[in-house]
């Protein structure tokens, strides 16, 4: 299984390719160009996806309040214009046909720490990002 993971931030879109054991096979980043708006960001992400073959899943971590079940940015600040209401999951899935999962960036960081990092094996912890 090959998983293409994205972290959409205000400055960079960071991405990496992982295998089924979550080994990082490669990574890179491109400028977000947030001032161009949410649709432009999703188009940049899709452009990256289209450079790869054999991707089984896509994971997207993004700033803002996220409805992770539906993959929608429920609320975002003005740092990324026209990002509130962006249907990230359906936009990517409709264009690529690849199952896509979307989560808030802080929740994603906490999940990473719980499974692979400082909180591994701990029942309770707090993840604070600034």
Please report, for each region that a protein language model flagged, where it lies by residue.
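Short, well-structured alpha-helical patches and their helix-loop capping segments
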Residues: 84, 129-130
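Short glycine-aspartate micro-motif
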Residues: 3-7, 57-59, 125-129
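Glycine-rich phosphate-binding loop and adjoining helix at the ATP-binding site
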Residues: 38-46, 57-58, 66-124
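Short glycine-rich, Thr/Ser-proximal phosphate-binding strand/loop in the N-terminal lobe
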Residues: 2-43, 73
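Conserved NAD(P)H cofactor-binding loop of Rossmann-fold oxidoreductase domains
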Residues: 63
């Amino acid at each position: 299984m090959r998983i293409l993971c994205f972290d959409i931030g205000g400055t960079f879109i960071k991405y990496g390719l992982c295998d089924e054991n979550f080994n990082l096979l490669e990574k890179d980043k491109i400028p977000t160009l947030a001032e161009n708006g949410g649709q432009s960001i999703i188009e940049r992400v899709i452009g990256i996806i289209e450079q790869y073959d054999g991707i089984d899943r896509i994971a997207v971590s993004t700033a803002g309040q996220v409805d992770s079940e539906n993959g929608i940015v429920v609320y975002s600040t003005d740092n990324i214009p026209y990002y509130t209401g962006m249907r990230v999951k359906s936009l990517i899935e409709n264009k690529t046909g690849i199952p896509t999962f979307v989560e808030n960036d802080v929740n994603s960081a906490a999940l990473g720490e719980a499974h692979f990092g400082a909180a591994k094996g701990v029942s309770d912890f707090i993840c604070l990002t600034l």
